[in-house]
Amino acid sequence: MAPKADPARRVVADNRKARFHYEITDTVEAGIALTGTEVKSLRGGKATIGEAYAGPSGDEFFLFNAYIPEYLEANRFNHETKRPRRLLLHRRQINKFLGATQREGYTVIPLKIYFNERGRAKVELGLGRGKKLHDKRETAKERDWQRDKARLMRDKG
């Protein structure tokens, strides 16, 4: 059985395909600069980060192409749905990501958006390299074997 999720960490958006398409080597928690209507919309749980990625713009990191829908109860002061959002990282983390993306061919992918125990919106970023087709097939084969093995053990025991 899967372990229980941390009740203080409420996941709003999950990039489930990221671990299939990328080989994630390192993960980092980052804050995200949001407007008020974005936070209210996130609490509704309708965000999508399937096509999102993080990248540098100047000397800061931004989250690009993340979809946070408009807050329905807001009036004319609503936000843009796919605007770049600034990520709150330490300088050492930014330099690490910059070095990995520019020299080594890595990509920074958002894995989850969640609210921590203090109610702050956070993004879990993964530093990953794209998998080749044969690696994806191997991952799918391993996952199927684990599922079959668990089914056999359950039926036998």
UniProtKB/Swiss-Prot annotation:
Positions with biased composition (Basic and acidic residues): 135-157
Lineage: Bacteria, Pseudomonadati, Pseudomonadota, Alphaproteobacteria, Hyphomicrobiales
Organism encoding this protein: Methylobacterium sp. (strain 4-46)
A cellular-component GO term for this protein: cytosol
Main localization, broad class: cytoplasm
Superkingdom per UniProt: Bacteria
Keyword annotations: Cytoplasm, RNA-binding
Chain's role: Required for rescue of stalled ribosomes mediated by trans-translation. Binds to transfer-messenger RNA (tmRNA), required for stable association of tmRNA with ribosomes. tmRNA and SmpB together mimic tRNA shape, replacing the anticodon stem-loop with SmpB. tmRNA is encoded by the ssrA gene; the 2 termini fold to resemble tRNA(Ala) and it encodes a 'tag peptide', a short internal open reading frame. During trans-translation Ala-aminoacylated tmRNA acts like a tRNA, entering the A-site of stalled ribosomes, displacing the stalled mRNA.
Stretches for region Disordered: 133-157
Family label: Belongs to the SmpB family.
HAMAP family reported in the protein's UniProt record: SmpB (MF_00023)
Name of the gene encoding the protein in the UniProt record: smpB
UniProt protein name: SsrA-binding protein
Localization, UniProt: Cytoplasm
NCBIfam families: PRK05422.1, smpB
Any GO MF annotation of the entry: RNA binding
